[in-house]
Amino acid sequence: MIDSARRVLATALSAVLLLGTLAGCANGSGTTQNAKSTDGAATSETTASAIKRGESHDPSIVKANGKYYIFGSHRAWLKSDDLINWTPFTNNLSTDYEKIFSGIWDGWAKQSSNPDVKGNMWAPDVMWNKDMKKWCMYMSINGANYRSVIVLLTADDIEGDWTYVGPVVYSGFEKVNAAKTDVWKVLGEGADLTRYASQTDTGINAIDPCVKTDDNGDIWMTFGSWFGGMWMFKLDPKTGLRDYGTTYQTVPNQSDAYYGVKLGGGFGNSGEGSYLLHTNGYWYLFASYGNLQQTGGYQIRMFRSDKITGPYVDEAGNTAVSTRAIGNNWQSDIGIRLMSSIQWSGNDNANIEVAQGHNSALVDDDGTVYLVYHTRFSGTGEKHEVRVHELLPTDDGWLVAAPYEYTGTKAADTKYTSKDVTGDYELVTHEQNTSFKGPKKVNEKNSTDYRGVNKPVSITLNDDGTVGGDKTGTWKLDKSDGTGDVTITLGDVTYHGAFDKLPRDKDGKDVMTFSALGGNVCVWGSQK
């Protein structure tokens, strides 16, 4: 998202969350209204579903000691026993952040246009470092004009307390202030820094870290920002900081001597919140396009590679790395869009998900893969909550998101026959050029006649393998391994995906669904 918009929204969210904390203390039930605690985290339990919701912007998921933990922007910490119900928790970062970050904030990121650290602790990622025998938290400390830094903190317990270690990577530097960073250490004293002011080259914001270990045991950190692309370099496993022994060449659209390997984006195109996941024989790169606001078009795009360093491509072979400016690239066909704003019978259409993004993902102990993201809603302005969907593998090596929220039913729990899945379905296509824009009539605030949402057509999966209805074609259930793998051909596009019987978001009714990918576009089906 645009940096200034993010700062303004962060300030507003902090104020709202603070008020929510006071309100939560006054109401002990937490059932029909938000019961908020901690600065940045909140939960609410709805009477309809009895799910204890969690609020955490830019949620990063990690599992430890049999529990699931989310670490988000603005010190929004959540934990869960089941990936469904979330409880906030606190540590020293919740209250002592000004003292903990005073050195790096005052010495680098603080500026007159951005004087308060409170709304500028963004998108942490947490991992266990087996060499250090510590939990390592990588957090963005955001400054104006891209003068930001990603720092490392460590803890013996994943819930904290946390100890500040030091900076990992800087942005927004120039010759007059480079001595405050590690730039001369990496590039050599007096190196030419001209290209670091260019958004078409390497003028990035050092935000949104993601830290992963590859098959060789090497630790890599991805990071980066909207305009200037997403990058990665190797970390030293003994310190958790940058590995200064590994160097990189400066090659346009491929790598940079300071920022390392280029993974995606650049040339002023949106692309942030990079997240890597290794499963199914591939490395998958997730990135968020668009602006994070309710009507900003925020969305998750996916690419994959055989190697952690890329190159990452989508199903059509488009590279994640931009080589030119693309106006409103969140409306482009580059990258697989996992989900969009939709209206169908399985949703509460007065409050549909919008601006879904900044995800993380988890391969659980049993091999189930989950997508974790924040979403806003059509009827609640900039309020956001965490959502979790299962990610299903396709027979051609991609991942697709299950159509409904994970509430305890796993796709792997049941094998399906043709008799189980034939019937009438609503079919939604996650068009890449659509995004929620509010009611068609702006003055009708409660209208559900929205602009920029995807609506279903009707199809029938017949028992003879044909598809009838608004779209026609053929379908086939793979019975060779007893899984729910499906191939559907509609027109000249063949989709590969999986069936999954799930409770609908709207009312909990169990229905057969499918999620599939073809022609670089995802589709969802939900039985009527």
Q: What residue ranges belong to the model's regions?
A:
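Carbohydrate-active catalytic/glycan-binding domains of CAZyme proteins
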Residues: N27-K528
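Bacterial N-terminal signal peptides that target proteins for export
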Residues: M1-A12
